C-alpha cells in the first residue's frame, strides 16, 4: 500500500482517502444542496449513510473531477478523525526519521 494514503472512517465501516478530502460540510446549506443535485445528475454522488440521516457532505478530488459523499457522521467527528490520522502520520514519520538517524550514527 502507498504510504501517502491515509484512510478516515466516515461511518458504517466506510473509509475515504484523507489526502483527497477538500471540504467537510453540513448538508443543509443551499449551495451544498445545489452542488449535490448536480453531482447526482453527473453520477458523482456517493450515499454512504446506510439509510440514516445525512449529517455531513464530504467533497473529494479525483482525477475526473469532484466527488460528493454523504455520511451519517457529524462534520466535527469527521474532522477530529482527520486530525487524529494526521497526528498518527506525523508520529510515524518522526519515528522513521529517528530510526534513520540512529542507523547513520551507527555506521
Curated annotation (Swiss-Prot):
Keywords: Plasmid
Family statement: Belongs to the RemA family.
Descriptive protein name: Putative regulatory protein BCG9842_A0044
Amino acid at each position: 500500500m502507498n504510504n501517502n494514503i491515509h484512510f478516515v472512517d466516515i461511518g458504517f465501516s466506510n473509509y475515504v482517502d484523507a489526502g483527497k478530502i477538500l471540504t467537510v460540510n453540513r448538508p443543509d446549506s443551499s449551495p451544498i444542496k445545489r452542488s449535490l443535485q448536480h453531482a447526482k445528475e453527473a453520477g458523482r454522488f456517493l450515499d454512504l449513510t446506510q439509510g440514516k440521516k445525512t449529517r455531513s457532505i464530504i467533497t473529494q478530488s479525483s482525477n475526473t473531477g469532484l466527488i460528493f459523499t454523504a455520511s451519517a457522521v457529524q462534520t466535527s467527528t469527521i474532522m477530529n478523525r482527520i486530525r487524529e490520522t494526521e497526528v498518527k502520520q506525523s508520529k510515524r514519520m518522526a519515528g522513521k526519521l529517528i530510526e534513520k538517524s540512529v542507523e547513520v550514527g551507527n555506521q
